[in-house]
Structure formats: structure tokens, C-alpha cells
């Protein structure tokens, strides 16, 4: 088991001017939690393109609410996330987020609303080695929408440092997710979470793809009762992506918001 010790989200090694994975591949057997978190931090550096589908179920008083997130990514900077809501009976209920690294466009099919805005510039000149680990953030090759499952699954460094490392973590074994071997991590009472689950019986289980380091499943539970499950049902690193994948024009009748 480990407590809040891993603070290396921003410390990606640089060799000959280029960042590279600190751990190229996991050794046989089970790694330590710190080794696994370091391996996960560099996940996106193990592929040039990615296709991923995440199915999310949130269990509440009205039953399971389902969302599906379809992710397409090409380094550097090109990314597209389409979120659909199968549990919503409204026809055509989907949301799009697409970026080329300079402009981010969003579109809600249900409301016919869109936005087109410059990417927010990141703070520059902050050497991670000059600040405490918990005060640093991971700088991705290709950005994804902030505070979303696609961002967390593909860029897990921040989640490992700011959430999992605030609880008690241990590796409980292996599993298979999306047809691929995965390592299972358990975490009791991570404190950096929403207030309504900030309680001692809150538990998170994740699985980590053994080859690439992305998160492939997350299960949240309170008092032994599952409240949320998000699982990758399709994972294709280095997938062949059509040239049109990252092209988008707002449909006629779209209202653009600033």
C-alpha cells in the first residue's frame, strides 16, 4: 500500500531535447504503485494516433444514466471527442468538442449551439523542478477537454497525483478490459474529490492498460455500493484515422455563442 507520495506528474524526462517515456514497458509481474503511476504519466507518448470509446454509467435515484465518449486523437494537437447520451430519449442528443491546437470548437446537436474560441495559452516559464510536485501540472502533447473522462483516461498523470495519491492505494491484481491485459489499482478515501463523496467509505478502483498506460476502467463506490462505472469498450492505439476525422463545419441554423 502507499499513501500520498507520488508527485511526478510534470517530471517527464527529456533526452536530446525531446520528452520520452521514463518507463518504456512494465516488467513481468506487478509493479509498485509509484512505478505504475510513472508509467501512466507517459501514456500518450506511446502512440501517434488513438481511437477510444468510453461507456459511462452513473447510478442514481432514476436508475443508470449512460454517456458514451468517442475519442479520436492525432499527435500533435488534433483531437475530437463526441459525447452521446443513449439514456436521453431526445433524438440527436450529442455534443462535439474538436481542436487543432489553436482553435477549439464545440457543438450541441440538441440545442444547435456552437462555440469557436482560441485555445487558452498555458503558463510558460514554470520549470517543474523549481516547484513542489503537487504545485505542478502535466503538459500534454495533445490537449483534450478539461475535467472529462477522455482527459483523465488518456492523460492520467493529474488524476494519479491529485486524486489517487491523496488516498491509500494498492495493486490488487490483473484483469482484461477491451480485450487487453490491465493492472487493477484500488484506492480508499481519496480526499481530492467532490464534497458529496468525501467520506471514509468512498472507494475507487481503476484498471490500467499494461501496454500503453491509459486508464481503461474506473469504478467508484460508496459504502460498498457502486455509484459510477466508466469503461473503455474499444481501444485502438496507432489506429488509421481518415483525413476527414478532424474536419468540421457548423450545420446550417447553428447559433454561435462567444
Q: What residue ranges belong to the model's regions?
A:
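Short secondary-structure transition/capping segments
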Residues: 94-103, 131-138, 257-258
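Non-transmembrane domains of secretory- and envelope-associated proteins
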Residues: 2-30, 109-119, 124-126, 131, ...
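Short Pro/Gly-enriched beta-strand edge/turn motifs at strand-loop
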Residues: 52-55, 153-156, 186-191
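N-terminal mature ectodomain segment of secretory-pathway/periplasmic proteins
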Residues: 2-119, 184, 196, 203
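Solvent-exposed helix/loop surface patches that form functional interfaces
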Residues: 125-177
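Intrinsically disordered, low-complexity boundary segments flanking structured domains
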Residues: 36-43, 155-158, 171-174, 216-221
Amino acid at each position: 500500500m502507499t499513501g500520498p507520495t507520488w508527485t511526478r506528474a510534470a517530471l517527464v524526462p527529456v533526452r536530446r531535447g525531446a520528452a520520452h517515456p521514463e518507463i518504456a514497458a512494465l516488467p513481468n509481474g506487478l509493479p509498485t504503485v509509484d512505478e505504475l503511476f510513472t508509467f501512466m504519466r507517459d501514456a500518450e507518448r506511446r502512440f501517434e494516433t488513438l481511437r477510444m470509446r468510453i461507456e459511462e454509467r452513473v447510478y442514481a435515484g432514476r436508475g443508470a444514466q449512460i454517456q458514451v465518449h468517442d475519442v479520436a486523437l492525432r499527435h500533435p494537437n488534433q483531437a475530437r471527442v463526441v459525447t452521446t447520451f443513449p439514456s436521453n430519449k431526445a433524438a440527436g442528443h450529442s455534443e462535439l468538442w474538436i481542436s487543432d491546437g489553436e482553435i477549439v470548437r464545440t457543438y450541441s446537436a440538441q440545442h444547435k449551439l456552437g462555440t469557436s474560441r482560441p485555445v487558452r495559452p498555458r503558463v510558460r516559464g514554470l520549470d517543474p523542478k523549481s516547484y513542489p510536485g503537487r504545485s505542478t501540472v502535466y503538459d500534454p502533447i495533445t490537449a483534450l477537454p478539461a475535467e472529462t473522462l477522455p482527459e483523465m483516461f488518456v492523460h492520467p498523470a493529474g488524476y494519479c497525483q491529485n486524486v489517487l495519491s491523496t488516498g491509500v492505494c494498492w495493486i490488487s491484481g490483473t484483469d482484461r478490459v477491451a480485450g487487453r491485459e490491465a493492472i487493477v489499482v484500488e484506492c480508499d478515501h481519496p480526499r481530492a474529490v467532490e464534497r458529496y463523496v468525501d467520506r471514509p467509505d468512498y472507494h475507487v478502483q481503476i484498471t490500467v492498460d499494461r501496454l500503453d498506460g491509459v486508464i481503461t476502467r474506473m469504478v467508484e463506490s460508496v459504502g460498498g455500493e457502486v455509484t459510477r462505472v466508466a469503461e473503455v469498450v474499444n481501444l485502438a492505439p496507432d489506429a488509421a484515422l481518415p483525413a476527414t476525422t478532424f474536419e468540421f463545419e457548423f450545420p446550417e441554423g447553428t447559433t454561435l455563442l462567444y
